[in-house]
């Protein structure tokens, strides 16, 4: 264990933890990696995939100098990073989406992200939010420990060894894949699936699978993160039950299951009791999304890792998967019912219906309009005085919502789209493919899939800012499947919730606009 991580975990065991500012230096570089045995150029943090693991405690602030050292002319050289799941109260400019919250950061510059995790804790992640850049490798885990976790009695071990990332991997570079997608209308198909940055593809070398080490009798909190651009994963461990306890940074009532579906950008914590005979067991995360007929390299069942008991031989498992109970939305109930969502079966203050269509494939429309990024970030336009949709350019997919209001969003079913709301969690009061509203104790998340049935969620506008709502299949976002909420515009400019705007954030747009297109 690295010393810095050990100090974080020791602090997490002390009830009187003092909030600290923790600094993580990020060098963003192009390097050649072969996570599945096929070597290719990448865009990665500190030369590794997944990127550097961030571990902090509840109440901490983070300071992350991002040194953009990208040089490859075959991939995007500017960048922005989204810190997925954090509310960013008063720091909407640090949220990361290009042209919503900031201009991209040019190459050969340093920009420092600074924000507080405040009262949030749980499992988060970070990734590029410029075009489809994170599909080239810029993605990593971000964990916030709670020294007073009300479910702490359920597990013994919760450290860097129990963080599990699920990803797909492409042998083609993201800009080339995007161009092919736009010209053919066919979404790119991944070559392999990775667990903790390791995997295999059909006909490729037998690269070692990742190993999660356990000791018999201990209970492990596995923090499982889908850092994928497209597919979802069905996570299970052979011969072991799992106790679900967290979704997207929100702790829920414990539920015993055998497997969990985890969509792009979703996170779950599950407790694994190492109570089986000392041996090796397959950790499985087969992918849904991506047709092997379109890419012979792909074997969706090769998304594997090894659970290895202390004392077991260092060999691959021979265990067999036995299907069992899958976690259901109807079983997910937050342990706390206070904000940011406001529950109740009364009418919302504002109702919004988002109708998805694809009349001009591969591009998507919402209510007849495809999202196109503005040239000036939405947040900057709000801070410059925009108070109505007609004040923003382009204005078509900007939804202005007043402060302290209950917003209800209804999305009629149209394909499998994991929608992510920035700046908030939301309460899923009508789950996809369900016909019963739950206003008492619905799941609370920041990513939820629209799976062919009407989905309705509610959130409360207590956090002024510019907040993206978009499909987290990155190819779909690039094809226009998004809107932006401009929340409480006047409160962004002045008052106790006004935005903090550091000088280096204000400098981003002039710096970006001054560089040649090839460096953008």
Curated annotation (Swiss-Prot):
<feature type="binding site" description="type 3 copper site">
    <location>
        <position position="84"/>
    </location>
    <ligand>
        <name>Cu cation 2</name>
    </ligand>
</feature>
<comment type="similarity">
    <text>Belongs to the multicopper oxidase family.</text>
</comment>
<keyword id="KW-0732">Signal</keyword>
<dbReference type="InterPro" id="IPR002355">
    <property type="entry name" value="Cu_oxidase_Cu_BS"/>
</dbReference>
<feature type="binding site" description="type 3 copper site">
    <location>
        <position position="127"/>
    </location>
    <ligand>
        <name>Cu cation 2</name>
    </ligand>
</feature>
<dbReference type="InterPro" id="IPR008972">
    <property type="entry name" value="Cupredoxin"/>
</dbReference>
<keyword id="KW-0439">Lignin degradation</keyword>
<feature type="glycosylation site" description="N-linked (GlcNAc...) asparagine">
    <location>
        <position position="299"/>
    </location>
</feature>
<dbReference type="GO" id="GO:0005507">
    <property type="term" value="F:copper ion binding"/>
</dbReference>
<keyword id="KW-0964">Secreted</keyword>
<feature type="glycosylation site" description="N-linked (GlcNAc...) asparagine">
    <location>
        <position position="239"/>
    </location>
</feature>
<feature type="glycosylation site" description="N-linked (GlcNAc...) asparagine">
    <location>
        <position position="492"/>
    </location>
</feature>
<keyword id="KW-0560">Oxidoreductase</keyword>
<feature type="binding site" description="type 3 copper site">
    <location>
        <position position="422"/>
    </location>
    <ligand>
        <name>Cu cation 3</name>
    </ligand>
</feature>
<feature type="disulfide bond">
    <location>
        <begin position="103"/>
        <end position="509"/>
    </location>
</feature>
<dbReference type="InterPro" id="IPR011706">
    <property type="entry name" value="Cu-oxidase_C"/>
</dbReference>
<dbReference type="InterPro" id="IPR033138">
    <property type="entry name" value="Cu_oxidase_CS"/>
</dbReference>
<dbReference type="InterPro" id="IPR045087">
    <property type="entry name" value="Cu-oxidase_fam"/>
</dbReference>
<feature type="binding site" description="type 3 copper site">
    <location>
        <position position="129"/>
    </location>
    <ligand>
        <name>Cu cation 3</name>
    </ligand>
</feature>
<dbReference type="InterPro" id="IPR011707">
    <property type="entry name" value="Cu-oxidase-like_N"/>
</dbReference>
<keyword id="KW-0325">Glycoprotein</keyword>
<dbReference type="Pfam" id="PF07732">
    <property type="entry name" value="Cu-oxidase_3"/>
</dbReference>
<feature type="binding site" description="type 3 copper site">
    <location>
        <position position="470"/>
    </location>
    <ligand>
        <name>Cu cation 3</name>
    </ligand>
</feature>
<feature type="binding site" description="type 1 copper site">
    <location>
        <position position="471"/>
    </location>
    <ligand>
        <name>Cu cation 4</name>
    </ligand>
</feature>
<feature type="binding site" description="type 1 copper site">
    <location>
        <position position="417"/>
    </location>
    <ligand>
        <name>Cu cation 4</name>
    </ligand>
</feature>
<feature type="binding site" description="type 3 copper site">
    <location>
        <position position="472"/>
    </location>
    <ligand>
        <name>Cu cation 2</name>
    </ligand>
</feature>
<dbReference type="InterPro" id="IPR001117">
    <property type="entry name" value="Cu-oxidase_2nd"/>
</dbReference>
<keyword id="KW-1015">Disulfide bond</keyword>
<dbReference type="GO" id="GO:0052716">
    <property type="term" value="F:hydroquinone:oxygen oxidoreductase activity"/>
</dbReference>
<feature type="disulfide bond">
    <location>
        <begin position="135"/>
        <end position="229"/>
    </location>
</feature>
<feature type="binding site" description="type 1 copper site">
    <location>
        <position position="476"/>
    </location>
    <ligand>
        <name>Cu cation 4</name>
    </ligand>
</feature>
<feature type="domain" description="Plastocyanin-like 3">
    <location>
        <begin position="375"/>
        <end position="488"/>
    </location>
</feature>
<dbReference type="Pfam" id="PF00394">
    <property type="entry name" value="Cu-oxidase"/>
</dbReference>
<dbReference type="GO" id="GO:0046274">
    <property type="term" value="P:lignin catabolic process"/>
</dbReference>
<feature type="domain" description="Plastocyanin-like 2">
    <location>
        <begin position="157"/>
        <end position="305"/>
    </location>
</feature>
<feature type="binding site" description="type 2 copper site">
    <location>
        <position position="420"/>
    </location>
    <ligand>
        <name>Cu cation 1</name>
    </ligand>
</feature>
<keyword id="KW-0677">Repeat</keyword>
<comment type="function">
    <text>Lignin degradation and detoxification of lignin-derived products.</text>
</comment>
<keyword id="KW-0186">Copper</keyword>
<feature type="glycosylation site" description="N-linked (GlcNAc...) asparagine">
    <location>
        <position position="108"/>
    </location>
</feature>
<feature type="binding site" description="type 2 copper site">
    <location>
        <position position="82"/>
    </location>
    <ligand>
        <name>Cu cation 1</name>
    </ligand>
</feature>
<keyword id="KW-0479">Metal-binding</keyword>
